Amino acid sequence: MTAQLIFALTLLLTLGVFAFTMRRIFINFRYTKKKALHNIPARLRETFKVAIAQEKIFRHPVMGLLHALVFWGFIVILFGSIEMVIDGLFGTERVFGFMGWFYNFLMASGDIFAAIIALAILVFLFRRLFLHVKRFYGPEMKPVSKADANLALSFILFLMLSLLGMNTFYLLEMHNEGHAFVGVYPVSQSLADLFAGMNDGSIIFWHNFNWWFHILLIFVFANVLPYSKHFHVFMSVPNVFVSRIEPLGKVDNMDNITKEVKLMLDPSAPMDSGAEEPIEKFGVSDANDVNWVNYMNALSCTECGRCTAVCPANITGKLLSPRKIMMDVRARMKEKSDGLIREGANFDDGKSLIGDYISEEELWACTMCNACAQECPININQPSLILDMRRYLVLEQSKAPSGLNTAFANIENNGAPWQFSPEDRMNWAEELYLNEK
């Protein structure tokens, strides 16, 4: 009974801290711009294909397979974690054992996946510590980012080792007490043979130790994740669901500008009621100007660097790093959060996303090729955010590279981006030989 009370208090503390942290993060969504979601069936298909089946991660076949196995393994092992919580609260042992063959299948799968995940994590740590993969580095990747990744991987490694240890000593304890064990544990059964000579007291101690170590590690890890780049453990699946399902090259129009153009072409054209509402600002200049999907993208970013690794601007030495864009949005929102909560959307601390975090040079280096969005394993759309920041610079600040300003002037004066009079547009054909009929 004492153990159950301690467990219940620990669980309550864990849930309380987690709820407080998540509230601090998700309250920021109220300060972002609205964005409607359509075509739910297509979103569900995209979620299954990209998030569950891990389709895009397999563009790097070997490491992609290891990552997918870790993801699928966590889904299977989650069943056992839920069982542990129930056992801890009610003092039971393997409470879901009544499920029979299905329980045996899940336990066997979880046992095998625990070993696979442990090996995969060792490979990931080796790559990070010794192989120096280029995309793991960059000006935006501070030492804390590298330490964060190593810490999270270490958490996962110890979670898997403690799970295997718990199963191993559970089998030994049941065998020594003459009880039939519940479930099937192929890997742990093999490990149990290595400890068969231990005395009963040691076996019971190590079973209890691994059980408590594993569940407490889960509780701690759950509360560390929201402060880590590995927050994508929670955010990646919902992020894929809300991600863009239209073609990546499609540019969303700005409703207010579309309205003005329609009125210029046809003053009697009917307007949507929503288009009549005035807006405070064109584009994005600060973190709370982004729409809620952009903010979810920023929270979900794993900092894996796959986007930056394929960015033609970054490859050719430009300042732009799509990964940095998402990291900056997240960091700026975190910095501004307290003020927004205290004073509302009008809070101004004298800083902004553009200028203090992201330079104009970075924004104009983007070619809008969408390579980053196509490569991102969780469908983050960096170009849409870059485009909105460019819109702010042009429409609100009248700032654009000289080449664009020339094109704008030509469009205004000549109806085309080129510096020729409309009357001269067919001059190129004067010397062509045309057969007359």
Roles of regions detected by a PLM:
Residues 1-270:
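Membrane-embedded alpha-helical bundles of multi-pass integral membrane proteins
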Residues 3, 7, 107, 293, ...:
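Short, glycine/acidic-rich beta->alpha junctions
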Residues 270-298, 308, 314-420:
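Ferredoxin-type iron-sulfur electron-transfer modules in oxidoreductases and energy-metabolism complexes
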Residues 65-72, 147-148, 155, 297, ...:
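Short, well-ordered loop/turn elements at secondary-structure boundaries
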Residues 5-6, 21-22, 61-68, 75, ...:
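Peripheral terminal and linker regions in Fe-S/redox and tRNA-modifying enzymes
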Residues 56-66, 83, 286-298, 303, ...:
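Aromatic-capped, Gly/Pro-kinked transmembrane alpha-helices
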Residues 24-28, 215-217, 304-309, 366-370, ...:
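Short acidic (Asp/Glu) and glycine-rich catalytic loops that position anionic groups and cofactors
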